[in-house]
Amino acid sequence: MAGGGAGVAKRLGTLLSGLLECGAFCGIIFGWASLVFVLKDLGYFKDLCQPTATPSPNRTLLPDCSWQDEQFSLVFTIGSFMNNFVTFPMGFIFDRFGTTVARLIAISLYTGGTLLVAFSTPELAVLLFPAMSMLSVGGILLLLTNMQVGNLFGKYRSIIITLYNGAFDSSSAIFLIIKVLYEHGLSLRAMFLFMAACSAWHLLRTLFLMPRTHIPYPLPPAYDYGLRCPGRSQSYRTYEEKRPPGEAGPEETPLEPSAPRGARGDGDPPGVSFRACVCSRVFAWHVAWLSVMQLRHYLFIGTLNPLLDHLARGDSHLVSTYTNAFAFTQLCGVLCAPWNGLILDRHKRGKTPRPEGAVGALADLRASVLSLVVTVTLCVLFSVCAAVPMLPVQFATFVLQVLSRSFLYGGNAAFLAIA
């Protein structure tokens, strides 16, 4: 860990506050099943329910709410789609304009989303569509800006990246808290107004505990970040201004010494462009792999409430119990994700120092193979359990789902950082 301007206390403050931010705000849309329970109780989309006659002797009329379930699933589907579709333009904004601009956009989207939910009613249930999309995009952008915090901790970088992704998974339990508080008499509007007010905390963290541009890797000497009252921000830009002319900065230093002009061999690759990275087979296969895995998880989360309702034969108490159990398991995401980080960083903890340059990068890639295999195995086991139409088996499904998701997102972020 490089010594310098930002002390251990400040780095730990950034790490822990980022962990809280990811764990309480970034991925709350994935706790959708708990919020749906509340929204159904409030009567959102209830006009889509149609009365049907049961085969009982007295021809009791029970509502058929399949259209209501489809509408709730559509809200989640659009929100989760935006979570992935907007990642690319948001990543461009983050790279082009830096951390502060990206986080201000994220905070604006997040605040707008919470306010839309707060002021929605059963008559204005359509507001859920833009609200969930804004919460989803704002949350993923906050997560993207927090990934770079791993650069502050050197050899623990992959562990911290996976830890943040685990906290992102665990944030889905926030909707469980909302569900429990709602059952104890707190209104949905009051809770979402409180979440909107928390944007002030995000703003303070943006100003004082995050860089204006990016956290470089490896860290330059005396690196500092954030505003310093009443002085000037000692960010990477300040370091760049102080650097003697002609000296290479940390992001400009090549991994290996450059060959003299004309000495490059025929087989030596030139500098890799962004287009070459996007068109590479490794990236294409990784995107395809991630898309299939994510689709499985999104399908499960988006259809969980009607699935539990079907398996419980309409028993709302059972549905509530299993919904709570699912949300509680999501809290464990932050505990499961570092296991994947340990797998990814296992070759860095030996007595032999990690090789530098391209050889070290290749060692990192090889270490990620086991992580990818374990992730796929967990997803297969989760899918098998989810296919069993028995309620008690769903407890095992919930556990395997949170393990699989934690390994998927944490391993994906770390793999992209390595590759």
Model-based region annotation:
Residues M210-A284, A288, L299, T303, ...:
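Long, low-complexity inter-transmembrane loops of multi-pass membrane transporters
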Residues L135, L142-L144, N151-T206, F326-P338, ...:
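Glycine-rich segments within core transmembrane alpha-helices of 12-TM secondary carriers
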Residues L344, K351-N412:
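C-terminal transmembrane helical hairpin of 12-TM major facilitator-type secondary transporters
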Residues I28-L39, D268, F274-P338, Y409, ...:
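Extracytoplasmic gate region of multi-pass secondary transporters
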Residues M1-D41, F45-D69, P257-A284:
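Cytosolic juxtamembrane N-terminal segment immediately preceding the first transmembrane helix
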Residues V8, F85-V126:
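Conserved MFS/SLC helix-loop-helix module at the cytosolic interface between two early adjacent transmembrane helices
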Residues G113, L124-L142, S291, S383, ...:
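Hydrophobic core of transmembrane alpha-helices in multi-pass small-molecule transporters
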Residues L35, L39, G138-N165, L304, ...:
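Intracellular juxtamembrane helix-capping segments at the cytosolic ends
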